[in-house]
C-alpha cells in the first residue's frame, strides 16, 4: 500500500499546496507510462527527468531512447526526488529504480540521452557524460548555461 499512499499523498498535496512545496517531495510508485526518453509517469503523475535531454520521438535516437527506457522501467517501482519546478503538465525531478539506479545517469551511459548543463548546474551528470563521451543527439539551446 506504500506505493498507492505515496502517489495519493503527492496528488493531495498538489490540490492544496503551492508548487514550491514540491521542493522536498519524494514520489514512489510504479512507472505506468514512458512518454519519451526524458518524461515518465509514476502512477498518473508525469515527471520530467531533470538535467537530461533526449532527442524527440520521431527521430531515430529519440525513438531508441523511448523504446529502451520503456523496456527497462515499465511497471517497475521508481522513486523520484522532485525539485519544486514544473514544466507544462510535468513535475520535475530525478528518478531511480532499484534495477537501473539513477535513470538519467543510466540513459547517458547508454548514449541515448545527454546532460542538459543548464538544468544540471550541480554537475550530478557531469561524470556520467564524460565517461559516455559527447552526446550524439541534438543539444537544445535551452540546455546551454545562461
Predicted regions and their residues:
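Bacterial N-terminal signal peptides that target proteins for export
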Residues: 1-10
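Small beta-barrel nucleic-acid-binding modules, primarily SNase/OB-fold domains
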Residues: 2, 18-146
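Bacterial N-terminal signal peptides
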Residues: 9-18
Amino acid at each position: 500500500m506504500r506505493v498507492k499512499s505515496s502517489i495519493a499523498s503527492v496528488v493531495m498535496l498538489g490540490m492544496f499546496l503551492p508548487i514550491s512545496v514540491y521542493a522536498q517531495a519524494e514520489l514512489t510508485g510504479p512507472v505506468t507510462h514512458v512518454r519519451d526518453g526524458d518524461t515518465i509517469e509514476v502512477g498518473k503523475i508525469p515527471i520530467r527527468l531533470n538535467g537530461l535531454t533526449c532527442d524527440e520521438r520521431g527521430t531515430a535516437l529519440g525513438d531508441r531512447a523511448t523504446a529502451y527506457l520503456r523496456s527497462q522501467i515499465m511497471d517497475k517501482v521508481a522513486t523520484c526526488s522532485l525539485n519544486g519546478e514544473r514544466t507544462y503538465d510535468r513535475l520535475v525531478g530525478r528518478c531511480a529504480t532499484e534495477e537501473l539506479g539513477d535513470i538519467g545517469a543510466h540513459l547517458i551511459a547508454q548514449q541515448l540521452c545527454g546532460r542538459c548543463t543548464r538544468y544540471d548546474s550541480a554537475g550530478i551528470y557531469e561524470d556520467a557524460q564524460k565517461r559516455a563521451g559527447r552526446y550524439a543527439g541534438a543539444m537544445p539551446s535551452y540546455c546551454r548555461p545562461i
